């Protein structure tokens, strides 16, 4: 009950309201292709790689419609008739037999694309030239890299350096077995020049203390480690409900397993809980990690992750950020949990052996059996890793995908709700020792499909989404829609032209030119806007509806007095003010303020009598006014008629009485 109260207080400000629809700048589709899925981008080359049912594409990231020879390539995925027939005889769903990509990654210094596809329910590995998409190696079947069933969550990362003998390898968090019943973190046998150097290595899938029905969302190669982000069943509560926690796990690249104990099993595996919660006496937890992106900035590595609550009537989402240094510190020094028949307990520091679980070794075969027995049963750190104050806690939505644009003084987060095809753009920056955020805008994406499959970002230019209908390309900013200098300067991609009073995309040229205004500080309005902000005059007629563009968390005033939502005045979630059925008392000067700074200023003039109409809108407004007057006249006439009838009846009754 207390958690519900916290939930109500925190999320009350985010009541739902329809966001504005935005059209894609460009779209790409192929009538011979089924579902469009994976995205991979090379910003320097301006290349967008797309995986789909039936093919792999290389598109020009600045215009995905351009199919010119120098910027476009297509690799068809083919299944022979005999392979298709054999697959259909065993598959539960014939769509599983269609050739379809599951995983795309760069390798060989971006010169090659590593592809794992499901072809006739077989995982097929290809290495393609990143320019022509021609095969650089013979395709091969390899288990444990990607899943056949697209409904299974998995993750994989190609690691080119730091492995034993510096052999390139893939690390995966995956489900194997006929029904996907085996959950494991896996590295296939290490080979070089066709020779096997080391056997495969994995977690123990038969022991759920290692992984308990995990749902993997991301994996990253960082230094001497590979990190895996996932959610898993932590325990069952007293009501028999399965409690889910989000985790980060870490393994060492040099790990080759133990000599006797933990043979071909990770000796360095260790994990901890990710804590994304609203602080309170009874914290409100977002326990289901949905997506994660890595950001390297100012010598530190950050992981931005989206989280949601369980799928209940009160589903909600938030974004949390985790620092690599904090993750490593906890995994390196935190107390470890031991699970017994009576529950889980933290072991004391002096019980932890000299070779601590999670420590990297140049030769894991040299670790003692005693230390490995301890590592085998002490996998979880007792404390959790804090994600700080949740960014944009929001109810009734699930943030399924995230991309992050790194700008000089801030990071811009794009969070997506796949099912509702909606995106939130958020500014996130550090001020002193405190991280702050500001919602810039929320938009609905107009795409011809029911959900988003994947997202990618071309920094400071476009974001891309895949769906069943194709690939859609959207600009990171809609500057021309900003009505004022203040709102324009809050968007880090925009700049205000003081001469033309228009908002345009910021460029290197206009950013420092005379007459152009943009904020140099994250989340702050440019002080120059106060000198150029103009009063907008809007003429309306009795009965009209009116919409004034405002800003998120803005406060509306009319002639210096606060405007509250009511029967005819509605302040939307995006900060817009909607006036319904305009009356004479609605005339005045309206201001939208935030932190006592005027963002929008407009004077509304309400005309009592219609002037001669000069447009269809004015004609309709006058028509409404005359209709109202006609209705009032009819009502008065009916009252007079009823009264007259009563008078006549009264006189007749009086005459008969005499």
Curated annotation (Swiss-Prot):
Cellular component terms per the entry's GO annotation: cell surface; extracellular region; plasma membrane
Keyword terms: Developmental protein, Disulfide bond, Glycoprotein, Immunoglobulin domain, Secreted, Signal
Keyword Cytoplasm: no
GO molecular function (one): chemorepellent activity
Official protein name in the record: Semaphorin-2A
Intrachain S-S bonds: 87-97, 252-360, 276-320, 479-494, 488-503
The species this protein was found in: Caenorhabditis elegans
Entry's family note: Belongs to the semaphorin family.
Subcellular location as annotated: Secreted
UniProt-listed GO biological process terms: axon guidance; axonal fasciculation; embryonic body morphogenesis; morphogenesis of embryonic epithelium; negative chemotaxis; nematode male tail mating organ morphogenesis; nematode male tail tip morphogenesis; positive regulation of cell migration
Phenotype caused by lack of the gene: Worms have defects both in early embryonic morphogenesis and in postembryonic male tail morphogenesis.
Quaternary organization: Interacts with plx-2.
Task performed by this protein: Regulates the formation or stabilization of cell-cell contacts at several stages of epithelial morphogenesis. In early embryonic development, required for proper ventral closure of the epidermis. During male tail morphogenesis, regulates precursor cell sorting and allows the formation of distinct sensory rays. Seems to control cell-cell contact formation through 2 parallel pathways, one involving efn-4 and one involving plx-2 and unc-129. Involved in follower axon guidance.
Listed Pfam families: Sema (PF01403)
Effect upon mutating residue 247 to H: In ns789; impairs nerve ring assembly due to non-commissural interneurons AIY failing to extend dorsally and enter the nerve ring. This phenotype is enhanced in a chin-1 ns399 mutant background
CDD domains: Sema_2A (cd11238)
Sema domain boundaries: 20-476
Residues annotated as domain Ig-like: 556-592
Tissue expression as described in the entry: Ubiquitously expressed.
Main location: secreted
SMART domains: Sema (SM00630)
Glycosylation sites: 65, 153, 275, 653
PSI domain span: 478-527
Signal peptide coordinates: 1-19
